[in-house]
A protein has these predicted regions:
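Hydrophobic, well-ordered secondary-structure elements that form the walls
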Residues: 167, 195, 226
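A charged, aromatic-enriched C-terminal amphipathic alpha-helix characteristic of glycosyltransferases
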Residues: 217-247
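Alpha-helical packing segments of well-folded alpha/beta enzyme cores
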Residues: 116, 139-142, 208, 222, ...
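Short, contiguous hydrophobic alpha-helices characteristic of membrane insertion segments
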Residues: 174, 193-201, 246-250
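C-terminal "capping" alpha-helix adjacent to the active site of nucleotide-linked donor transferases
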Residues: 196, 201-218
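Short amphipathic alpha-helical surface patches that serve as generic macromolecular interface elements
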Residues: 161, 192, 202, 206-209, ...
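Nucleotide-sugar donor-binding catalytic core of glycosyltransferases
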Residues: 1-191, 233, 237-241, 245
Length: 250
């Protein structure tokens, strides 16, 4: 809802019956729309009730067969001032050998995040930064002095995690398994263009990091592509334009 308030859309909050565990309804121009913010690939049971369902973490393989499910960019920034400040103050130059992996192991990702951190520490020692930053601004400023950020997704191993999405928005090159996701505007994430892909079991992660050391200009280009993708698809204005374009299509 903060996206709509930022683009100065008047909002009226009303109490409505619950829809699902990870969904809510919104009415725009007298049309009832479903927002599905689940991290998972589940489908709302009463999907046929809605002409449009905007789905976070939309994948072509799981959702394209449903004509009323529309891709939607997942949550990135709650405070958009941090994004605007970050665009001015965060400058990814890839001029350092520090490798970022600032994710706390937990939930569905506890095993793989612990395994990846152990792998990175064994190989790179004190060149790995695994600190957890309580302040978002501190987390973003780590970008200024890193080689690359290794991102291990949370609920699923092939989903776009919020931290990775924020880093992409600010122009940092990231490494993760293949992200089978489509953002608002119907634009897919593309490996080697918007991020560097590694195997799902991270067995080639060290190889990918070593590649970054040898191709720093390419890393900068990937980070820039990611930032441009975010600006095109996932800012409040871009998302609102996408919503309007789908509502007007009948």
């Amino acid at each position: 809802m903060n996206i709509l308030s930022i683009v100065n859309i008047p909002l009226t909050l009303v109490e409505i019956p619950p829809t699902g565990e990870n969904t809510f309804e919104i009415r725009i121009n007298d049309e009832l729309i479903l927002i599905d913010f689940s991290d998972h690939l589940t489908i709302e049971k009463n999907l046929e009730k809605y002409r449009l369902c905007f789905k976070y973490h939309y994948t072509i393989s799981d959702h394209s067969k449903y004509t009323n499910i529309v891709p939607f960019s997942p949550v990135s920034f709650h405070d958009w001032n941090l994004y605007n400040l970050g665009r001015k103050n965060i400058h990814y130059t890839c001029n350092n050998d520090i490798i970022l992996n600032n994710q706390r192991p937990g939930g569905a990702a506890i095993e793989r995040r612990t395994t990846v951190q152990r792998m990175l520490r064994d190989r790179y020692g004190n060149r790995i930064d695994t600190r957890f930053c309580k302040k978002q601004d501190d987390f973003f400023h780590l970008i200024n002095n890193c080689l690359v950020s290794v991102c291990v997704p949370g609920a699923r191993n092939n989903m776009l995690d919020r931290g990775q999405f924020q880093y992409m928005a600010l122009g940092c090159c990231t490494i993760s398994p293949y992200l089978d996701e489509v953002l608002a505007g119907g634009v897919p994430l593309k490996p080697q263009l918007h991020y560097i892909v590694c195997r799902p079991d991270y067995s080639d992660l060290i190889e990918r990091i070593e590649w970054c050391k040898l191709h720093r200009d390419r890393c900068i280009s990937i980070g820039r592509n990611a930032a441009n993708l975010f600006a095109k698809t996932s800012t409040p204005n871009a998302i609102w334009s996408w919503i309007l374009s789908k509502i007007s299509t009948r």
